[in-house]
């Protein structure tokens, strides 16, 4: 069930391959044991596939959640706008430099403020990842979708997963830990069993990818393809081997 680094010379291929693998495994275990996840809002009713057992995660694996209401995020956004103008402007500058911005300056400011606010809350609660209820209560409060903000958090090594998918956030953390933080995880946010193939599943990406996974320049469109709100991001992801995808969230 496991492998080990056999007795070998330091200059041997076996040692060169085995030692990095050992370090990566240690990093995965360390990350798993030190995970706390910020949960913004409750699970949407229809998303039964993302139910998790919070008590079991804590008792068996010491993985804890830090639930916060959406209103707390709204208050943090106000603080960011009033007290952290430099951080806010730095995020705005990033979007203006690295994306094709098609939304208004006001909406772009809100996208940037949401990113900083979520980052602040993760720091305050000691969280290394987050999950969020993406719609529609958030739009009622701040008028934007969170995807462009979340993609930037992903880019900076703070995984955020949609619709409070706690297991998805844990998966991202472990994948990135296995690469020692050199690569960003790509997570298919909605996965459902195939209706005919018992050994198959349907992957539909409804979450967020890091900007570094983009093959084309990301676009911040005026509206989402489903919801009439700004705050989404669209780009074609880099093709790796047999897998490729197009993000439009």
Residue ranges of model-derived segments:
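Cap/lid and interdomain-hinge subdomains that line or gate substrate/regulatory clefts
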Residues: 1-89, 95-99, 103
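Short intrinsically disordered, low-complexity coil segments enriched in acidic
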Residues: 2-7, 243-249
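Anaerobic metallocofactor- and corrinoid-dependent redox/one-carbon enzyme cores
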Residues: 56, 60, 110-119, 123-248
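Active-site helix-to-loop segments that bind/position phosphate- or nucleotide-bearing substrates
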Residues: 105-108
